[in-house]
A protein has these predicted regions:
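Bacterial N-terminal signal peptides
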Residues: 14-23
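Surface-exposed beta-loop interaction hotspot
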Residues: 136-141
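N-terminal mature ectodomain segment of secretory-pathway/periplasmic proteins
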Residues: 30-104
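Gly/Pro-enriched, hydrophobic low-complexity segments
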Residues: 107-110, 131-133, 151-248
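Sec/Tat signal peptide C-region and signal peptidase I cleavage site
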Residues: 24-28
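Acidic/charged, solvent-exposed loop-and-adjacent secondary-structure segments enriched in E/D, K/R, S/T
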Residues: 104-132
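Solvent-exposed coil/turn segments that connect beta secondary-structure elements
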Residues: 54, 71-73, 81-83, 96-97, ...
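Bacterial N-terminal signal peptides that target proteins for export
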Residues: 2-14
């Protein structure tokens, strides 16, 4: 049985917010430089996307659609539009705060930090994934551990370990960035060094002259055959977005 939305069920990589062009990385770039450039281009200055999310479980498959708006590094709104049981559920990231709206409760709730690692909408993504760039860059120390060639691209593999005393979920992350700026995969390890899950860019297309991961999949290692896949239906970048969009009032009562 799939979980219905509640403050305990959280969000994904926002379905396909853009990973834009990263200038070809060089050995002169530090691991942090490579990651920062990739994350800076993840959403452009602003973005709007329509995406679908497929949650595959042993007892069935669930499909949802959503709209996502982003502005800068710290503003994002995700609003589910279908199916009817999920329509109206929404998540707002504003700075370091994350809010959720459940239309059945007609209430906006600010998530505590302890809830950020929980499942979003019953998927394999979490609210923690919303604030990927800010938390990864600031909370971890980054080392370029490998450069390899694959599919006509150089792949820069970066190991990120948490800074001493910083409260984080993961004991380590391994991130791979292509030389064109696509975040190719992310591996997540627990505190004892065991890999827990992996997110991969499974399909990459060129949109507006940019390499764009139109299909991203999260898989949990101890759940073979199960996954959550986010597929981009349409997207646009560097657009004007009114400031009211990223407010708690609009989260609860969206304007047309």
């Amino acid at each position: 049985m799939f979980q219905s939305f509640s403050p305990r069920n959280l969000r994904p990589v926002i379905a396909a917010c853009a990973l834009l062009v990263l200038p070809a990385a060089s050995f002169a770039q530090s691991a942090e430089d490579i990651l920062r450039s990739a994350f800076d281009n993840w959403r452009a200055d602003s973005s709007h996307a329509v995406t679908s999310m497929t949650i595959k479980r042993s007892n069935g498959t669930r499909e949802m659609t959503m709209e996502t708006w982003t502005q800068g590094e710290d503003k994002a709104l995700v609003r589910f539009t279908a199916p009817a049981r999920d329509a109206g559920n929404a998540t707002l990231q504003f700075g370091t705060a994350t809010y959720v709206f459940n239309p059945k409760l007609n209430q906006v709730i600010k998530l505590p930090s302890s809830a950020m690692s929980q499942s979003w909408m019953g998927s394999d993504f979490s609210y923690e994934d919303l604030s990927r760039s800010e938390r990864v860059i600031g909370d971890y120390t980054h080392t370029l551990v490998e450069t390899r060639s694959e599919g006509g691209h150089k792949i820069y593999v970066i190991e990120s370990v948490p800074k001493r005393g910083v409260p984080v979920v993961w004991g380590k992350q391994v991130l791979a960035v292509r030389d064109d700026g696509v975040l190719y995969f992310v591996e997540y390890y627990d505190q004892v060094g065991e890999r827990v899950r992996v997110m991969s860019a499974d399909k990459i297309e060129t949109i507006d002259g940019r390499p764009y991961p139109v299909e991203m999949t999260m898989r949990v290692d101890d759940k073979p055959g199960e996954f959550t896949r986010v597929t981009t239906v349409s997207s646009e970048f560097n657009i004007d977005i009114p400031s009211y969009l990223f407010t708690k009032s609009n989260l609860q009562n969206p304007r047309d």
